Structures are given as C-alpha cells and as structure tokens.
Curated annotation (Swiss-Prot):
Pfam families: CBS (PF00571). Gene3D superfamilies: CBS-domain. This is Uncharacterized protein MJ1426. PANTHER family: CBS DOMAIN-CONTAINING PROTEIN, CBS DOMAIN-CONTAINING PROTEIN CBSX3, MITOCHONDRIAL. It comes from the Archaea. The keyword Transcription regulation does not apply.
Length: 168
C-alpha cells in the first residue's frame, strides 16, 4: 500500500519533485533585511534561498530569522507602569525609549542576510519523490526545500503548500 503522497502524475508514474517544483525567488547574502522583507511581502512568501555573488546556494532565510534579529536588537525595550512620582518624567523617558527603539530597529533592518541566514541548507534533488520530500520536511521541521542539480546549482523550490497542492 503506497502512502497518500505517492500520487501518480499524468503518465501514471509516481510524482517527483521536478513535477511540482517552482522557480525560486532568491535573495543574496549581501542584501539588507529591509530589502528581504519587501521582497517577501511583494511575493507573498515567508522564506527564500540565499545565493552568493557567484549564484551558488549558501543559505536560506525565513521570516523567523528576521523576527529573531529584530527581537534581539530590541531586548532592552521595557515599558513598565510608572509610580505616581515618575509621571512627571514619563513623557521624556518614553520618548527616549521610543527613539532608542526606532534607532535599534533601523540598525536591525540594515543587517545583512549573511549574518542571520541559516547556513545548513537541506536540499532536494529533482528526482526525489514528493513522499520523500514530505518526510524530509517533517523530519527537519522545515517549510521549504531548495531543489539542486548534481552540481549543486539551485534549479527550483518546493514548499509544504506545493506538496498539498500536488494531492489535489
């Protein structure tokens, strides 16, 4: 009995990654995070493979990586309820904290992708079955698999959503 993801393609063969992979939207390791955020929003994606200047796959970046960076940069932002005696100083202290927060946020958004990306990239080959790809994603708790050829060149990407679409 085959698993549910061993769906057959139109030729009656088990579906492979190459049957469902999409053209990847990529970022480069020297991009600023603000540029990556804009790219993610524009393309409605939550992660992307990272290439170096030679076009080689060197990492992967996700919204989680970006959020961790922003949170790390802003750990000192502590706004607590003031005592009645502090009310006189509160507007000034709050303004300074907000100013510090905005400065930290600007600095965080200038961070380079190479400084926050995940370097250990789990990849798929085009001839991998979609069932094996699903197992790999579940085992490693990842949402996307870059697809590489035998030379390690990025040729596509498969997401959990792509696997689900393949079932329909």
């Amino acid at each position: 009995m085959r698993t549910i993801l061993n769906k057959l393609n139109i030729n009656g063969e088990i579906m492979l990654i190459k049957d469902i992979m999409k053209k990847p939207i990529v970022v480069y390791e020297d991009n600023d995070l603000i540029d990556v955020i804009r790219l993610f929003r524009k393309n409605k994606i939550s992660g992307a493979p990272v290439l170096n200047k030679d076009g080689k796959l060197v990492g992967i970046i996700s919204e989680s990586d970006i959020v961790k960076t922003i949170v790390t940069h802003n750990e000192d932002l502590n706004l607590i309820l003031p005592s009645p005696l502090d009310l006189i100083e509160l507007p000034l202290k709050t303004a300074l904290k907000i100013e510090e927060f905005m400065e930290d946020l600007k600095n965080a958004l200038k961070t380079k992708v190479r400084d926050v990306m995940t370097r250990k990239v789990i990849v798929a080959k085009p001839d991998m079955t979609i069932n094996d790809a699903a197992k790999l994603m579940v085992k490693n708790n990842i949402k996307r698999l870059p697809v590489v050829d035998d030379e390690g060149n990025l040729i596509g990407i498969v997401t959990r959503g792509d696997l689900i679409e393949a079932l329909i």
